[in-house]
Amino acid sequence: MQTPQFLQQRRKFAAAFLAFIFLLAVVDTAEAGKKEKPEKKVKKSDCGEWQWSVCVPTSGDCGLGTREGTRTGAECKQTMKTQRCKIPCNWKKQFGAECKYQFQAWGECDLNTALKTRTGSLKRALHNADCQKTVTISKPCGKVTKPKPQAESKKKKKEGKKQEKMLD
């Protein structure tokens, strides 16, 4: 029969042996992770930059629409694609729906042409749109009249009606 001291030594040896095996596995795994991986080949694309057409509204002359994109290149997987876009409805469409301008105040009325003008400088161009740097717009000169506030005119009408009823 084995003595308790022998059994204790055997357990210590087994524990040490298992710890040693565990350490070997950990070190081996760590070194395996450090192995040099073959570098991924960087694909140099022969594809050109995307060139986008103007945004074409789905209905009307503003709102949601689409634009076509194309690019050149012998080994391009995709040479055409369609992208959704939006034309803001408050932009001046006569200068291109993708060009946003900051306008100055209206100038004085030209008596010879009966027009007043103002200029706008380019504020923003969507999707590299080809926009003019400055634009000028004209509109007919109109009578300068200050509209009365509606609240006052309604109040006067009510008072007038009350006086008419009192007279009747």
Swiss-Prot record:
Location relative to the cell: Secreted
Top-rank taxon: Eukaryota
GO CC list: endoplasmic reticulum; extracellular region; extracellular space; plasma membrane; protein-containing complex; Schaffer collateral - CA1 synapse
PTM (free text): Phosphorylated by NEK6.
Region (Chondroitin sulfate A binding): 147-168
Predominant subcellular localization, coarse grouping: secreted
BP terms from Gene Ontology: bone mineralization; decidualization; dendrite arborization; dendrite regeneration; estrous cycle; integrin-mediated signaling pathway; learning; leukocyte chemotaxis involved in inflammatory response
InterPro entries membership: Midkine_heparin-bd_GF, PTN/MK_C_dom, PTN/MK_C_dom_sf, PTN/MK_diS_sf, PTN/MK_N_dom, PTN/MK_N_dom_sf, PTN_MK_heparin-bd_GF_CS
Span of the signal peptide: 1-32
Pfam families registered for this protein in UniProt: PTN_MK_C, PTN_MK_N
Keyword entries, A-Z: Disulfide bond, Heparin-binding, Mitogen, Secreted, Signal
Annotated disulfide bonds: 47-76, 55-85, 62-89, 99-131, 109-141
Region described as Disordered: spans on this chain: 139-168
GO molecular function, one term: integrin binding
Region (Chondroitin sulfate binding): 92-99, 123-131
Record note on quaternary structure: Interacts with ALK and NEK6. Interacts with PTPRZ1 (via chondroitin sulfate groups); promotes formation of homooligomers; oligomerization impairs tyrosine phosphatase activity. Forms a complex with PTPRZ1 and CTNNB1; this complex inactivates PTPRZ1 protein tyrosine phosphatase activity through PTN interaction and stimulates tyrosine phosphorylation of CTNNB1. Interacts with ITGB3 and ITGA5. Forms a complex with PTPRZ1 and integrin alpha-V/beta-3 (ITGAV:ITGB3) that stimulates endothelial cell migration through ITGB3 'Tyr-773' phosphorylation.
Functional description taken from the UniProt entry: Secreted growth factor that mediates its signal through cell-surface proteoglycan and non-proteoglycan receptors. Binds cell-surface proteoglycan receptor via their chondroitin sulfate (CS) groups. Thereby regulates many processes like cell proliferation, cell survival, cell growth, cell differentiation and cell migration in several tissues namely neuron and bone. Also plays a role in synaptic plasticity and learning-related behavior by inhibiting long-term synaptic potentiation.
Protein family membership: Belongs to the pleiotrophin family.
PANTHER family: PLEIOTROPHIN (PTHR13850:SF1), PLEIOTROPHIN FAMILY MEMBER (PTHR13850)
The protein's name: Pleiotrophin
Gene from which this protein is expressed: PTN
